Amino acid sequence: MAKAKFERTKPHCNIGTIGHVDHGKTSLTAAITKVLAESGGATFRAYDSIDAAPEERARGITIATAHVEYETANRHYAHVDCPGHADYVKNMITGAAQMDGAILVVSAADGPMPQTREHILLARQVGVPALVVFLNKMDMADPDLVELVEMEVRDLLSKYEFPGDDIPIIKGSALCALEDSNAELGREAILKLMEAVDSYIPQPERPKDKPFLMPVEDVFSISGRGTVVTGRVERGIIKVGDEVEIVGLKATVKTTVTGVEMFRKLLDQGEAGDNIGALLRGTKREDVERGQVLAAPGSITPHTNFSGSVYILNKEEGGRHTPFFTNYRPQFYFRTTDVTGVVTLPEGVEMVMPGDNVTVSVELIAPIAMDEGLRFAIREGGRTVGSGVVASITK
């Protein structure tokens, strides 16, 4: 069966749900599809279908990142339902990196929890430009306490340099929307939320004119067709027939893109912001891996040595409890993967304490496609302990 062609009529925006486990992120995602389905802007996706990977069911928590698409009168959205559990922060980092904006879900009955804070911090680190808040479970909350919860959320957002006073906070109940009970807390609140998302989350400026680059998230081999790599196009445009380089981790290789698809529909081209699959000519599944990038030939080079300006989380933010010294060996999380690196502190700096800002030199054990301004997280065994940006490339 031929694939339906994806028509691009409305501006496209990538958003997602973030927040503490069990505050209702997946229920809200389902509720949005249900309410927008009434106007033909979505196909209803039940909670179970969004929470679908087998290991998730067993634990009742969302591990994988689910992709849902829907549209409002103004925009087409690709929505990722991010993992909510602390154990899965690694997945959140890859999920949150795919967002032009996010809906922070906070249970009005419980208020901000440790992962609420962690996700706001992560959103700040991975550069999510704008957040909108949905105070969920209003059907179960004590009305007198809701105002306090709202103030608490605004303070927390301001603390992590989001404009806490200006961010829209919509109160409602995903459950009411799903069960068609209380319309004010259910359907109407969801419509209000989507209005806020439409107007408050800025239309992302797509760096379409820059040279093509797509971080590799996943690699599949499709029998009879070849190797498909998937990811979100970071910048530029990719057309069928374009030459690309596979850069990072190993020697750079040239190949040709023989097909581009999005949401399982064929495209003439993929552009910045699109989540696509690219079919590569003559490339074996084992030639490409997560952590590499596809890029316009000559536009980006792999490097192991750079100086980075970093912020090390303090203990209260879930960071280290002790200082580190020269020769510290954490993992550096670039785009989609962790690479171990050795840190050298600047002259005259004996040690770095949790909560410090410092410029460090790093030598990675494998080369990563990088240019100045590339952001990264510093992690130890899956826990984020710092964040930084490449200040200059030294080798």
Curated annotation (Swiss-Prot):
Residues 173-175 are annotated as: G5. It catalyses: GTP + H2O = GDP + phosphate + H(+). Residues 136-139 are annotated as: G4. Residues 10-205 form the tr-type G domain. It is found in: Cytoplasm. GTP binds at residues 19-26, 81-85, 136-139. Residues 81-84 are annotated as: G3. Its EC number is 3.6.5.3. Mg(2+) binds at residue 26. One of its GO terms (cellular component) is cytosol. GO terms for molecular function: GTP binding; GTPase activity; guanosine tetraphosphate binding; translation elongation factor activity. It comes from the Bacteria. Residues 60-64 are annotated as: G2. Keywords: Cytoplasm, Elongation factor, GTP-binding, Hydrolase, Magnesium, Metal-binding, Nucleotide-binding, Protein biosynthesis. Residues 19-26 are annotated as: G1. It is an enzyme of class 3 (hydrolase). Belongs to the TRAFAC class translation factor GTPase superfamily. Classic translation factor GTPase family. EF-Tu/EF-1A subfamily. GTP hydrolase that promotes the GTP-dependent binding of aminoacyl-tRNA to the A-site of ribosomes during protein biosynthesis. Monomer. This is Elongation factor Tu. It comes from Acidiphilium cryptum (strain JF-5).
